[in-house]
Structure formats: C-alpha cells, structure tokens
C-alpha cells in the first residue's frame, strides 16, 4: 500500500540532441511565461514597483544594514530563501530593489510549477494534465491575496513543490539534485516543512535503497541550518511558539479558508451571499467529497492512496499553521474593494493538493478510458469528465486571475527610493534612518544604498 505512493514514471526513449535542446528551450520559455503571468496577476500598483510586508520591513532593510547575515532568525526561525532574495535586492540600484523581490518570487513559483510537471509523472501520465497541474499552481485563485510576486511568500510555492519531491523517484543525478535542493530550500525557510516527516519516513520504509533518498538528505540538511536558529530564538526569548489557537477555531479556519476557497475566491463569496458562509462551505465541501470519494473508490489503489495522502497532508498543514498563528483564526476576511484573507498563504499548499487530487483522478479516468492507446479510442464520456474538470478549475482561474488586494497598499516603491536617495544627498552624517519592523527604525550608512 505504501509503495503505491512512490510510483516510477514510465521510461521514454533517450531524446536526440536536437530534441533535448528543443525541450530545454521550451521549459525555459514555460518558466518565463509563468513568471510574466504571475507578475500580471498583481492589480493596481505593479508588482515590480511595490515591496510587500517583510520584504521591506525585514529582509531588505536588514540586508542593507547587515549585509550577508542571512542565517538570522525572524519570528523565531530561519527564512533562508527570502533572506537571500533580500540580499540580492540590496546589491542592485535602490529603485530596482522591489523588482528583484517581485521577479524572484514569481520565477520561483514558475520554477516550482515546472518541477511539479516533471515530478508528477509517476501519477499523471498525460503531459497535458501535468501541464494543467503546473498551471494550477501558477493560477491558484487565492494567490493574489498574499503570495504572488514577492519574496516573503515564495516559500509556500516551494512547500507545494516539496510534496511532489517527496513522492518523486528521479532517474538522473540532476533530478536527484533538484529534488534535494527543493527540500533544503523549503526546510531552511520554514519549520512548517516538518509536516512532510511522515511522508519521508514512509519513503524510507518503502524505498530502502540509498539512491532513492536525495530528497530526504536535502530535507535533513535544511534542519541542520534551521534548528540552531530556532534554538537561538528560544535562548533569546524570541521564539515563535508562545500561545496556541483554540481547536474549534482551527477546524473552522480549515473549512472556511481551504474548503470554501478551494474552487475560487470570488466564487466562494458569491456562494456565501446566496447561501451563507456555513452552507456555502457545505456545498463546496460536499462536492469535493463526492468527487474525490468516488475517485478513491473506483479508480484503483494508487489514486486512493494519493487522494487520502493529499487531503490529509493539506489538512494537517493548515491545522499546524492555524494552531501556532492565533491572528489568522480571529481575523475576519474582507471581500470589498480591497480583498484580504488572514493567513491566505497557509491555504496555498492544501488548496493546491486538492487540485492535484482532482487532476490525478482525471488522469486515472482518462487512462481507463483508453488514453494509453490513443486519443481516437477515448470514450466520449471520459472526455466529458476531463473537460468538466477543466471547466471547474477554469472558473477560479478566470474570475480570480487579477484583483485588488492589500498586497499593494504600501504604495510605489520608486517614490520611497527617491526619498531615501534625496535624504542621503542632504545628510550631514552620511547616514539615513528608515522605518523597519521589529526595531521600529534602522540607521545605516548612505554608502549602502546603490544609485
């Protein structure tokens, strides 16, 4: 049963040099296209001219003040990937710093989508459906609320990729290296990666050979840098874990921010306006339960194991995030002119895994319908089922492609950069004091600002 979680992808003939070159080019274009699409999803102020939340208040300001000090805690743990992006942003002209965060965050998401396309081959033989899976990450309906086009929340895309890395059995050393890098980046950026411990333990049990555990090694290596930072935070009484959310609030949070929002942000609010929040949640939840339950019962052991694993992982992930982040369970979402959902970043992985379960089920239906022989042999009802899945996902993709959120309420970064540079030009001390999180302000040398 556990072995069904780690299938080997069908092996294809080695590509010719021209085919390999074309494939590499196509993949680079796909990541670039995904990056552009993600940047386009930010409404009002362009993503490349807006520095969001900790990108400004923590990572950028601290990179300017203390260059290359990336192994330091914030909120009780290490966030290595956002720290590295912040360091990169500090090395470019000040006016372009916001663009570094935006493009890096979008490129990471696009790269994760491409990685998932490859890593899901053992479960999804259809290349078209694997492309749909990658698109599901790029076009995730809730993404504009917090995670699109910034550095601080790029980690949650990597966490989605880590789920697939834990299941993937790469044949090549390059594939193993990429899987290890994904695992290391995730674990070194958030201790939430602990949720994949049971999955990786199952991998060790099912696949005892050492060559199967590049991802496990990467995950463990991430803890080598993460644990000392967490312990340092406890020693200085700045740890993350202080109080916990009530269990009832946590379950309600999962139902209302994951299940209800799974098929679309605006669609969920429309359902709420008609049926009320709880009934709308029941409608969406029952629909998902029927579809995924049917797939688990009728589409074979591999689909059944995957559906259970994906749903359970998403549930545990959300519960853990909500338990240790009291703010998100006590703050109401907003659907007005400026949309906001507290902690929507924690919905990325569970919502994406629900989409993945639907797509894996669709692949099984397509395969049983004759897709292995050719499209000409696929029964019409099978094509209807796959088309229906596309329509369900497309509703959220279209209606939630771009909308105004609190993500851009910080204003234009270019104006801030000009103000900083003007202040430095007239500074008698050669220093500048700027707003910062945690400490309130930071005073740094004007020589740290690149023009």
At which residue positions do the language-model features occur?
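Intrinsically disordered, polar/acidic, low-complexity terminal segments
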Residues: 1-64, 68-146, 173-177, 181, ...
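Multi-pass, polyprenyl lipid-linked donor-dependent membrane glycosyltransferases
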Residues: 143-162
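Hydrophobic/aromatic-rich transmembrane helices and adjacent perimembrane loops
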Residues: 154-156, 333-363
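Membrane-interface transmembrane helices that cradle and orient dolichyl/undecaprenyl
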Residues: 158, 162-178
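Transmembrane alpha-helices and membrane-interface helical segments
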Residues: 165-172, 199-204, 288-295, 348-368
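Transmembrane helices and adjacent periplasmic/lumenal helix-loop junctions
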Residues: 181-202
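Membrane-interface helix-loop junctions at the exits of transmembrane helices
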Residues: 316-334
């Amino acid at each position: 049963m556990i072995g069904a979680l780690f299938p080997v992808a069908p092996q294809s003939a080695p590509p010719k040099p021209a085919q390999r070159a074309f494939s590499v080019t196509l993949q680079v274009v796909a990541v670039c296209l995904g990056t552009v699409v993600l940047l386009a999803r930010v409404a009002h102020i362009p993503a490349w001219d807006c520095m969001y939340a900790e990108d400004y208040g923590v990572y950028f300001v601290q990179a300017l003040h203390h260059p290359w000090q990336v192994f330091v805690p914030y909120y009780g743990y290490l966030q290595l990937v956002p720290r590295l992006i912040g360091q990169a942003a500090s090395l470019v002209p000040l006016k372009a710093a916001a663009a570094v965060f935006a493009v890096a965050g979008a490129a990471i998401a696009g790269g994760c989508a491409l990685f998932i396309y490859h890593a899901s081959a053992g479960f999804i033989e259809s290349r078209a459906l694997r492309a749909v899976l990658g698109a599901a990450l790029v076009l995730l309906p809730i993404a504009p609320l917090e995670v699109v086009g910034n550095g601080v929340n790029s980690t949650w895309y990597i966490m989605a990729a880590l789920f697939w890395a834990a299941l993937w059995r790469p044949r090549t050393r390059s594939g193993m290296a990429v899987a290890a890098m994904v695992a290391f980046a995730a674990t070194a950026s958030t201790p939430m990666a602990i949720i994949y411990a049971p999955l990786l333990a199952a991998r060790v049990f099912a696949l005892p050979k050492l060559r199967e555990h590049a991802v496990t090694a990467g995950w463990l290596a991430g803890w080598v840098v993460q644990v000392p930072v967490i312990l340092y935070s406890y020693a200085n009484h700045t740890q993350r874990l202080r109080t916990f959310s009530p269990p009832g609030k946590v379950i309600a949070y999962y139902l209302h921010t994951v299940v209800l929002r799974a098929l679309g942000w605006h669609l969920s609010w429309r359902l709420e306006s008609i049926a009320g929040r709880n009934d709308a949640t029941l409608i969406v939840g029952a629909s998902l339960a029927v579809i995924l339950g049917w797939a688990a019962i009728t589409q074979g052991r591999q689909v059944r194991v995957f559906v259970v694993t994906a749903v359970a992982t998403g549930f545990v992930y959300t519960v853990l995030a909500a338990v240790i982040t009291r703010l998100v369970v006590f703050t109401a979402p907003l659907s007005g002119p400026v949309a906001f959902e507290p902690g929507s970043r924690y919905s990325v992985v569970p919502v994406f895994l629900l989409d993945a379960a639907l797509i894996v089920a669709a692949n099984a239906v397509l395969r049983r319908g004759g897709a292995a022989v050719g499209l000409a042999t696929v029964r019409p009802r099978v094509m209807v089922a796959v088309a229906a899945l596309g329509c369900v996902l497309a509703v959220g993709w279209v209606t939630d492609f771009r909308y105004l959120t609190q993500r851009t309420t910080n204003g234009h970064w270019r104006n801030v950069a000009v103000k900083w540079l003007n202040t430095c030009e007239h500074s008698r001390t050669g220093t500048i004091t700027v707003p910062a999180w945690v400490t309130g302000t930071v005073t740094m040398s004007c020589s740290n600002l690149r023009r």
